[in-house]
């Protein structure tokens, strides 16, 4: 569950959160310090909508505005000695390698500022955890200058690891662990209510090696004394991790590489892929990206919350007519605020847009008690983002035996860190126009946008709309392309219709029938079907 509903609901939660749950806004040593008092000149330049949103926030939560910091508290951790690890890859060593180019000139073997990074690697004994029989590695990427430590867990392909592609999986939030994707969606196993490991025959490592990464820092098993609060900053760390990982394991570097994720990964993935492609000399063979039920172009996607909640997305209405009309009435102001955010990309305009729009367009649905990740179901466990299985996963991962087997250095695991969620929101990251990066990707690699059609929070209507509207060289032909049936082709259910797909050039949109926010959870067979065919280059 790459980008959990809690991610998108931050604005709603902030607008409706009870006073005992303070909003964390930065104060000391921050440009945000007492924003409505100390930045009066900036405030005067805001539009009326943005001013009103800030005033409403300050009135509702005066103590929060003035007293709380934006940074998440560091996780308790104990660093393991270097002797614990099988390998430590020094970024400074990799950075110092020079080679002779085709033109006879000396150049660095790989680009990028890697001196401050190290990668620690430990082989995971498959027999200790019983997740899968394949070769596994876990460890940390260390940013020594900024005290950041990102946790990863690698699973080799069950099929042909010497030739199968490598995939990086990212959950969203922002602030949610990618181990959710591992155990709830597409990894080699799940965890049942008795904390037993259950084999997943539809795991995405059936025909690909998969890296699950907890990012940004202070998410899952990752930790830091500092913080990352925007998508751009997170991209540098991901590039460093992949570069050092493939340096340690060159046998995987020759394979095709893909980045996949969901929800807020609709922000992450375009930026991370762009960061990789910006380096001419690299050891990352990036071929495509896959974004599932993502948030990428809010201006185009937010108008589709009302239709999805009101019976126009292929499922019965969740909201009554009066509430639907109220959402329609709120939409113009919402879109005006997002347009201002797009024009300036200033937190002072993007934050009010997030707060107002999430309250107006997502809040009414959230208050029904229906699962925002699946319009067909009630939210069964609000504390675990509507899925009780997340509680089992969290309990299993918090076992000392599990942490020791993985070389974990933090004292506890949480599936989501809502401090990180708020940090990204209050830096204006939520509403920024990351779709503008996508045309540059399409020029170089394949891009898949897929969407389970029962999701509300990042629904298929909005994802189809932004892909049709995207400004790129093939826009007109893509928008006119026919949505064709997507059917199973390679097992006993051959011919079963699992969705719709359209494609032109390097750009593909896919609607998956019966899938919620987490397609691999709801439709595991269909998920593995399209995934394998995408990696095979069918679209």
From Swiss-Prot:
Enzyme class (EC, first level): hydrolase
Listed InterPro entries: AB_hydrolase_fold, Peptidase_S10, Propeptide_carboxypepY, Ser_caboxypep_ser_AS
One example of a Gene Ontology biological process annotation: proteolysis
Propiece residue ranges: 18-122
Keyword field contains Amino-acid biosynthesis: no
Protein keywords: Carboxypeptidase, Disulfide bond, Glycoprotein, Hydrolase, Protease, Signal, Vacuole, Zymogen
GO molecular-function term, one example from the UniProt record: serine-type carboxypeptidase activity
Cystine residue pairs: 176-416, 310-324, 334-357, 341-350, 379-386
Subcellular location: Vacuole
Record protein name field: Carboxypeptidase Y homolog A
């Amino acid at each position: 569950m790459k980008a959990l509903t809690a991610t998108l609901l931050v604005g709603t939660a902030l607008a409706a959160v009870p006073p005992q749950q303070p909003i964390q806004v930065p104060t000391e040593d921050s440009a945000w310090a007492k924003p409505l008092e100390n930045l009066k000149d900036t405030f005067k330049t805001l539009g009326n909508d943005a001013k009103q949103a800030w005033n409403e926030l300050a009135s509702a939560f005066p103590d929060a505005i003035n007293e709380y910091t934006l940074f998440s508290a560091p996780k308790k951790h104990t660093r393991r000695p270097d002797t614990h690890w099988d390998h430590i890859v020094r970024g400074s060593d990799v950075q110092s390698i020079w080679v002779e180019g085709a033109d006879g000139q000396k150049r660095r073997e790989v680009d990028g500022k890697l001196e401050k990074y190290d990668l620690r690697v430990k082989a995971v004994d498959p027999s200790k955890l019983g997740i899968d029989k394949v070769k596994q590695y876990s460890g940390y990427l260390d940013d020594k200058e900024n005290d950041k430590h990102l946790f990863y867990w690698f699973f080799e392909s069950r099929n042909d690891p010497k030739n199968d592609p490598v995939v990086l999986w990212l959950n969203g939030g922002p602030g949610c662990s990618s181990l959710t994707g591992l155990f709830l969606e597409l990894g080699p196993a799940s965890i049942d209510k008795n904390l037993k490991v259950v084999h997943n025959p539809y795991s995405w490592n059936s025909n690909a090696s998969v890296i699950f990464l907890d990012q940004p820092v202070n998410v899952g098993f990752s930790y830091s004394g500092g913080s990352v609060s925007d998508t751009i900053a997170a991209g540098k760390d991901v590039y460093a991790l992949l570069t050092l990982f493939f340096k340690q394991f060159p046998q995987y570097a020759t394979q095709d590489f893909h980045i996949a994720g969901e929800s807020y990964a609709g922000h992450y993935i375009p930026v991370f892929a762009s960061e990789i492609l910006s380096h001419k000399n690299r050891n990352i063979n990036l071929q495509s990206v896959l974004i599932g039920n993502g948030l990428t172009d809010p201006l185009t996607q937010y108008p589709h919350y009302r239709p999805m909640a009101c019976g126009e997305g292929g499922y019965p209405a969740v909201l009554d007519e009066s509430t639907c009309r109220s959402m329609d009435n709120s939409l113009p102001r919402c879109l005006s605020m997002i347009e201002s955010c797009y024009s300036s990309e200033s937190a002072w305009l993007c934050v009010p847009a997030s707060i107002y729009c999430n309250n107006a367009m997502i809040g009414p649905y959230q208050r029904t008690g229906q699962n925002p990740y699946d319009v067909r179901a009630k939210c069964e466990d609000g504390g675990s983002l509507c899925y009780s299985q997340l509680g089992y996963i969290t309990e299993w991962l918090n076992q000392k035996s599990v942490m020791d087997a993985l070389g974990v250095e933090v004292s506890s695991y949480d599936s989501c860190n809502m401090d990180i969620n708020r940090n990204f929101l209050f830096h204006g990251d939520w509403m920024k126009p990351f779709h503008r990066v996508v045309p540059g990707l399409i020029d170089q690699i394949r891009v898949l946008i897929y969407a389970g059609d029962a999701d509300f929070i990042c629904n298929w209507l909005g994802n189809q709309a932004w892909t049709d509207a995207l400004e790129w060289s093939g826009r007109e032909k893509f928008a006119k392309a026919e949505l064709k049936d997507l059917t199973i082709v390679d097992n006993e259910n051959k011919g079963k219709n699992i969705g719709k797909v359209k494609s032109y050039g390097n750009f593909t949109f896919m609607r998956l029938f019966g899938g919620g926010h987490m397609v691999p959870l709801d439709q595991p067979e269909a998920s593995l079907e399209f995934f394998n065919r995408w990696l095979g280059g069918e679209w």
